[in-house]
Amino acid sequence: MTVYLPDGKPLELPEGATAKDVARALGEGWERRAVGAIVDGELYDLLKPLPQGAKVRLLTEKDPEFQTLFRHTLAHVLAQAVKEFFREKGYDPESVRLGVGPVIEKGFYYDIEAPEPLSDEDLPAIEAKMREILKRDLPLRRFVLSREEALARYRGKDPYKTELVLEIPEGEEISFYQQGDEAYGFTDLCRGPHVPSTGRIPPHFKLTHVAGAYWRGDENRPMLQRVYGVAFRTAEELKEYLWQLEEAKKRDHRRLGRELELFLIDPLVGKGLVLWLPKGNVVREELMAFMREEQVRRGYQLVTTPHIGSLELYKTSGHYPYYAESQFPPISFKERGEEEEYLLKPMNCPHHIRIYAYRKRSYRELPLRLAEFGTVYRYEKAGELLGLTRVRGFTQDDAHIFCTPEEVKGEFLGVLDLVLKVFATLGLKDYRARIGVRDPKSDKYVGDEAKWALAERQIEEAAAEAGLRYTVEEGDAAFYGPKLDFVVKDALGREWQLGTIQVDYNLPERFGLTYVGKDGEEHRPVMLHRAPFGSLERFIGILIEHFAGDFPLWLAPVQAVVVPVSEKQEDYAREVAGRLKEAGLRAEADTRPERMQARIRDAEVQKVPYILVVGEREKAEGAVSVRRRKKGNLGTMPLAAFLEGALREYRERRLEPVF
């Protein structure tokens, strides 16, 4: 057989040759250093046979793909270590049943059904066993079995692997990887790829936690235990990640939401349904007020639509039944003699479309920008719900722009300006844009070819004019139009997808939307979907973690706490708090019978931006002693001076304090 090297040179090899044979043919240096290969653009290990005529580029430990290889093998090492862990506890290793063990971002996991529950306390012992397996430098071997042989290996022993074998299409190769010998090693059903031996795995890994995971993500299937690990090429990368992990725990919005009394998810109310507590609602209302001001200034018209709609509305839009799995079931009143069925609103767009369509529209009215803080409902599986970032009911800062094809670029520029204003106001400085365009080889897209080409060109031109750093992702467009979204890094360097802007040719067509053009003829408008925050719940969850609950003054639930030194200043403290409130600040006087230092500490724990201490001197002078969170004591100043500065900081939505 013939394969081709990166420089185009052919290499003759025996039939069934692997990348290992390529390395051997290229000399001792490559044979020693090679860990895998890129074969026709796909990641291979050294063990998988190469196709005839393949283009082969060998990989070493310096290549970024090495990380994928060793993380995958670490998942197998984890499974082997768990089996050995239970063998030493007196269990038959066969009693440990295995689900799947893939590579994930930063590491790996394995889903396991063990004879007794695993806990985080077991992880150091399992991790120690993994390190032993690395030191043994067990070579990996790949082999293929027939369907019957593969089923015989698992049937009656491991229902999860049996199910996976049965799902492999007829005629597709069923491969296994074995590390060590059959008796004391480990063999797993796997497509690969892997490192050549366990000794090639860098020792810079750590098991992080154990969590429950339903088999195949289905809450009606057995609950397995998912053991997570992280792994890196260098000790420095691992150290940095573990620091980030600890910092992320401190910033976890679920923990801070509880401690700062921002929100609540009550099981009696329902899973994934958020109760905003008074302090959390302040953050929500401030964000909405900011967005409302910006939208009105930019020519949006605010509308309100109901939380449910007729099933026919969503059949017309195509949201039902195509997305039925992510929706709550229809609401029926047939037993009351009413034929019409309803659906909890999964999207705001059909409602806005009906507002557009209630009368004839002229080109003079376009672009028409309709905006709403609309609450929608999606059915998320219980196991996938996560604090504010994955919920079943959420509010979107949703808007839909109806415009002519020629106006798409201008509207895109307007939305980009709004999104960038949001990012700047909240201190989100590190971001990049992605433009999703058609895959020219696919025929899944609706709409006119010329309109698509125009929209894609207009989006790229708008992104360039806005000075954005962007990439064009071929095939990332939705079937109904191209899009642009942002990937934003938070304070910990984690990436979040925000601020999607979507061009839509499909819904105007489905609803028969028209406008009368300059020529007196009817034309089809283009529709833009945009939501800079996206879900308010998710956005606030991200902000809580980005700021570590330490919000800038304009978002802080309590902006100032007045602390009297003793009982003698309590009336003055209340007077100061009253004046702050009258001026529009959120202020409280803390007159509890606690030591002054304890009250100051409590305000700091609650992350209140300003603590105003008042004693006899301050009372006599009409002043306050100002402490700014993270900056300490700023000295004494007249109350009027503090009020003027604090109001400026609040009204201008400053990130940094004025004092």
UniProtKB/Swiss-Prot annotation:
Cofactor(s) needed for function: Zn(2+)
PANTHER family in the record: THREONINE--TRNA LIGASE, CHLOROPLASTIC_MITOCHONDRIAL 2 (PTHR11451:SF44), THREONINE-TRNA LIGASE (PTHR11451)
Notes on the domains: The C-terminal domain recognizes the anticodon bases.
EC number per UniProt: 6.1.1.3
Oligomer status and interactors: Homodimer.
GO cellular component terms attached to this protein's record: cytoplasm
Membership in a protein family: Belongs to the class-II aminoacyl-tRNA synthetase family.
Localization (cell): Cytoplasm
HAMAP family reported in the protein's UniProt record: Thr_tRNA_synth
Residues in TGS domain copies: 1-60
Entry's transmembrane regions: none
Region (Catalytic): 234-548, 252-552
Matches recorded under SUPFAM superfamilies: Class II aaRS ABD-related (SSF52954), Class II aaRS and biotin synthetases (SSF55681), TGS-like (SSF81271), ThrRS/AlaRS common domain (SSF55186)
Protein name per UniProt: Threonine--tRNA ligase
GO biological process: threonyl-tRNA aminoacylation
Annotated residues for binding of Zn(2+): C349, H400, H529
Cofactor note: Binds 1 zinc ion per subunit.
Keywords, in A-Z order: Aminoacyl-tRNA synthetase, ATP-binding, Cytoplasm, Ligase, Metal-binding, Nucleotide-binding, Protein biosynthesis, RNA-binding, tRNA-binding, Zinc
Top enzyme class: ligase
Catalysed reactions listed for this entry: tRNA(Thr) + L-threonine + ATP = L-threonyl-tRNA(Thr) + AMP + diphosphate + H(+)
Keyword Acyltransferase in annotation: no
Organism annotation: Thermus thermophilus (strain ATCC 27634 / DSM 579 / HB8)
Main location as per UniProt: cytoplasm
Single GO molecular function: tRNA binding
Record function comment: Catalyzes the attachment of threonine to tRNA(Thr) in a two-step reaction: L-threonine is first activated by ATP to form Thr-AMP and then transferred to the acceptor end of tRNA(Thr). Also edits incorrectly charged L-seryl-tRNA(Thr).
